A protein has these predicted regions:
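Divalent metal-binding segments
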Residues: 1-196, 215-280
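Short, small/polar residue-rich loop motifs at catalytic or cofactor-binding pockets
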Residues: 73, 208-209
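Acidic (Asp/Glu)-rich catalytic clusters
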Residues: 172-175, 198-208
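Short amphipathic
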Residues: 209-215
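Polar interaction faces of repeat-based domains
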Residues: 283
Length: 284
């Protein structure tokens, strides 16, 4: 279970001390054993009093014995403590992964704890305990019920994975969903065979259909990771004056894949926030 780190009016987190206190409280109340991961979601640096991301030094005040990973409200960044860095062997010798950045302490290559885009993948795989099929179905149906209570009758998941899509099919076959659910698997990591196996569905079966695929070409304006054609007025800490961010998925991989999908008539969603990323999409 993740810690809710939302700021007002959604939540109650107003500063970094509040975040540290929530992490410490979870560890103490649940008597978590050393080495147990502590996860949170929803902090917004722009709404914190300090107007910055919590870094490893901040989170070390919560624990030096428990790896901590907190995800930004945009989903495009995360911050971790020293225990998390040590457990994953991330240090000054770690290179930035393609499409991501490990932020560093000023004047050094030592990670400061903040991870941009694909750098989150250095940590975020297999941290959550697997959800069994019964709980998965319960959570899905409770979520649909909440949407329907607000009058929303079509729900889209633009970041699905194929294993969860298969579980959704089994669940919907057991009992039709109360709203239409359309899923688009996140396809940045699909190889050619996986992409060729996708068959988009034009109609719903038991309230579910696979709508096509989705790619992500860049990050978010909030995180200063949206790919721009002109430099940011204010980039992330330590960024060069000509900082424009970067693509999270290279054109040389995207172009042949989108051409294949268009030829096959497969609907394709593309995350492209910055104007340079939009140009990548148009030119592709």
């Amino acid at each position: 279970e993740m810690i809710d780190l939302a700021s007002p009016p959604v939540g109650r987190v107003e500063n970094i001390n509040d975040i540290v206190a929530l992490v410490k409280s979870k560890i103490d109340k649940q008597q978590l054993a050393p080495g147990t991961w502590v996860l949170g979601f929803g902090y917004d640096d722009s709404l914190l009093e300090e107007k910055r991301h919590p870094n490893r030094d901040d989170l070390d005040r919560a624990s030096l014995d428990h790896p901590v990973m907190l995800t930004h409200v945009s989903g495009h960044l995360a911050t971790v403590n020293s225990a998390a860095l040590q457990q994953q062997n991330i240090d000054q010798n770690t290179s930035n992964p393609p499409g991501g950045v490990v932020r560093r302490r000023p004047g050094s290559r030592e990670p400061n704890g903040v991870m941009e885009e694909t750098a989150m993948g250095l940590f975020s795989r297999n941290l959550l305990a697997p959800i069994d099929d019964e709980k998965f179905e319960h959570l899905v149906r409770q979520t649909i019920k909440r949407y329907v209570s607000y009058g929303i009758t079509t729900i889209q998941d633009g970041g699905a994975n194929m294993s969860d899509i298969e579980r959704l099919r089994v669940s919907a076959k057991r009992e039709s969903y109360a709203a239409d659910v359309v899923v688009f698997p996140w396809s940045n990591f699909f190889d050619d065979d996986q992409l060729a196996a996708i068959e988009a569905e034009s109609s719903y079966t038991n309230g579910l259909r696979l709508g096509g695929v989705k790619f992500g070409l860049d990050g978010s304006p909030q995180g200063r990771t949206a790919f721009l054609s002109q430099p940011y007025n204010e980039g992330p800490p330590g960024a060069a004056p000509d900082y424009r961010a970067y693509p999270t998925y290279p054109a040389e991989k995207f172009n042949p894949k989108i051409a294949q999908l268009i030829e096959r008539g497969i609907p394709t969603l593309v995350h492209a926030n910055g104007d340079a990323a939009i140009d990548m999409l148009i030119n592709g």
